A protein has these predicted regions:
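PRPP-dependent phosphoribosyltransferase catalytic core
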Residues: 230, 245-247, 252, 259, ...
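Terminal amphipathic helices with adjacent charged low-complexity linkers/tails
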Residues: 304-320, 365-401
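Short mixed-charge
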Residues: 94-105, 199-220, 383-411, 524-534, ...
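Phosphate/ATP-binding catalytic cores across multiple sugar-kinase/actin-like superfamilies
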Residues: 232-235, 338-359, 372, 377-381, ...
Length: 633
């Protein structure tokens, strides 16, 4: 991807289902769970590099023994930093207690992070500072085991203000406006209520406080806590939590916006944001890893009992299509095929753009995430060529010669790795003009791959958000090869609307497609349209979010996709570019055909799966009209 965009986040939960001694005997280490968590997090590093966190809960420890351990880091290699610190704890313990160290029970009692429950998180920050306090898991402490709570998630809620007001109504005094704190306190509030309910129930039966605590731990209704906590949530989320006594859960939003996958055998239960990560770390077949259903929670009790329960009535499935295009690891079997299909669906428009002149066309891609879609594009071009070959051979009939046949069979798409990405250049120069010159050299080219002033150069990117890197760097350096024409194709459709479910695409003015539409409106003397829409958007924002419509969609209805793409090309064309420039985007139909199970496309279409999405779009437009450069939620 030429434009780097961030998103939240990666989450993993492991519950060991056997005693720690089992893993020592079978796998040679009582730290089996920690090793697996490290591998899961290391494999999901694509999902978060702003920080990381790990927490564990020890089951059935003696009074006076710490049972919750947590470590978070914002170091450049946060996951490695965390597990290096944890490893040092074991090294120190072994050096100081060589005689006791090999005793598993001694380890559990005396060494931190020897828990049977392990929660890991990788963070990409879309809101709030990049500090240690922003890193998950978050902890709500209490002296009672069953009132302790740890939460980590891949989520974004659109209605934090509303949820904070509800916390105030409940008598709380929140000090931070953040969805992470809001979620923690909502779950914590209903966890407290459930504890109070059970305490009263067992007190009436005459049990002592000590015995009541034990009964509460056995009887806590995790599902009811989640049902009450999530009633007002509007957003996309996978929420994972652990309670101090040993219950744990993972809850997915009712539209299935954010991904979660689950694997369970008789040794371990694991939930993670990505399927192939589980497959690789636990060496299991794709059929053994299943998706956590939207609106459901995976709940595991302290005694190891596992259930999946409906928490929120599932709504229309709108799983995030950007996960398939870009965010998720490309080695997932289905995602790999889907990205290939995205490339294939571009073939007809590409052939039309080059006037079917494959002899004078070079195909390439922008490294590295576009590689799989590029493979699909090339396969589609190859199929077209093969059909042409067959037609030409049949036309020759008995007049065919070895020389003629050889020329026909020699036709193939011209594929070159034209553009290369070098390591980031470090610089202390801060003025914008100098930075622009330096970014030019982040990408390099392979010389003599293009016939000067003859060839068309077709380059695939997986998406174009702002287009800054294309304009400042890629197009300029491609032009040094002297192609007659440069065609940039995007395997994703035009990004037109803000995301509010965890992707860092929240400000309208940062979308080149929005800039193009606004430019077209101004060129056609229709600026009154913007004023009218501004008034409409403000009026919509006075309504409850459930009644609002997305007025931003009206901006794009005046123009065809092709007109907007053409204007994008005009806006992205750097001064002095000699080659003709054309931009081609994936169609919505092509996206849906390629990714049939992930139809969440609100950033392309403005069709938000939750009411909060329309509110965010309207607020984003009002911000644009008022010159406010901040996100709308």
């Amino acid at each position: 991807m030429s434009d780097k965009i961030q998103h939240e986040c990666g989450v993993a939960l492991i519950r060991l289902l056997k005693p720690l001694s089992f893993y020592q005997e079978k796998y040679g280490s009582s730290r089996y769970g920690l090793h697996k968590m490290y591998q899961l997090m290391d494999k999901m590093i694509n999902r978060g590099q702003d920080g990381a966190g790990v927490a564990t809960v020890k089951l059935d420890v003696e009074t006076g023994t710490p049972y919750i351990d947590r470590l978070r880091s914002i170091e450049p290699k946060a996951t490695q930093d965390i597990f290096s610190q944890i490893n040092d704890l074991y090294i120190n313990a072994k050096q100081k207690n060589p005689e006791s160290y090999n005793d598993i029970e001694w380890q559990k009692k005396n060494i931190p992070f020897m828990g049977e429950l392990i929660l890991g998180h990788l963070r990409y920050g879309t809101y709030g500072g990049n500090n240690i306090q922003s890193c998950h898991p978050f902890r709500r402490q209490n002296n009672w085991l069953a009132r302790n709570l740890l939460v980590a998630g891949n989520f974004n809620l659109t209605n934090v203000d509303e949820l904070l007001e509800h916390l105030v109504e409940l008598g709380q005094h929140p000090t931070v406006k953040a969805d992470t704190v809001t979620v923690m306190e909502k779950i914590g509030h209903f966890l407290d209520k459930e504890n109070d309910r059970l305490f009263k129930q067992f007190k009436e039966k005459g049990l002592t406080n000590f015995d009541i605590s034990k009964e509460i731990q056995k009887n806590i209704d995790v599902a009811s806590i989640l049902i009450e906590s999530s009633k007002r949530w509007d957003g996309g989320y996978v929420m994972a939590g652990m309670m101090g006594h040993g219950d744990a859960f993972v809850l997915r939003d009712p539209n299935g916006i954010r991904p979660a996958y689950l694997y369970k055998d008789d040794e371990v239960l694991v939930v993670a944001s990505e399927r192939p990560v589980i497959q690789t770390v636990f060496n299991v077949d794709i059929k053994e890893v299943r998706e956590l259903k939207p609106g459901y929670a995976a709940i595991i009790k302290k005694d190891g009992t596992f259930t999946e329960k409906e928490i929120i009535e599932p709504l229309e499935r709108k799983a995030c299509s950007f996960e398939r295009i870009y965010f998720s690891r490309g080695n997932d079997a289905d995602i790999y095929k889907e990205r290939q299909q995205l490339g294939r669906y571009l073939v007809p428009n590409v052939l039309k753009a080059i006037d079917y002149d494959l002899e004078n066309t070079v195909f390439s891609y922008i490294p590295n995430t576009a590689e799989v879609a590029f493979g699909g594009l090339v396969e589609g071009i190859d199929e077209y060529i093969n059909k042409q070959k067959a037609t030409d051979i049949l036309k020759l009939g008995t007049n065919i010669t070895e020389s003629t046949l050889g020329k026909i069979l020699a036709r193939h798409p011209r594929i070159h790795k034209v553009i290369l990405k070098d390591a980031k250049q470090r610089t202390f120069i801060t003025d914008d003009e100098s930075r622009d010159n330096l970014v030019n050299l982040v990408y390099d080219i392979t010389y003599e791959t293009v016939k000067k002033d003859v060839d068309t150069l077709v380059v695939l990117d997986d998406s174009i958000v702002r287009g800054t890197t294309l304009k400042q760097s890629i197009l300029r350096i491609l032009d040094r090869l002297h192609p007659k024409k440069i065609i940039i194709i995007s395997s994703a459709p035009q990004i037109r609307y803000p995301d509010c479910y965890g992707i860092d695409m929240a400000i309208l003015s940062k979308f080149i497609a929005f800039d193009a539409a606004i430019s077209l409106i101004k060129e056609t003397a229709k600026e009154s349209v913007l004023i009218n829409l501004y008034d409409k958007a403000k009026a919509e924002l006075l309504k409850p979010k459930e009644e609002q419509i997305n007025v931003v969609q009206e901006i794009y209805r005046t123009f065809t996709n092709e007109e907007i793409s053409q204007k994008i090309g005009d806006l992205l064309k750097p001064k002095g570019l000699n080659a003709e420039l054309q931009i081609i985007y994936q169609t919505i139909e092509g996206l849906h055909q390629s990714c049939p199970d992930n139809l969440g496309d609100w950033y392309f279409t403005g069709n938000y799966p939750t009411p909060g999405g329309n509110k965010v779009a309207n607020k984003a437009f009002v911000n644009f009209m008022e010159g406010i450069n901040e996100r709308a939620y």
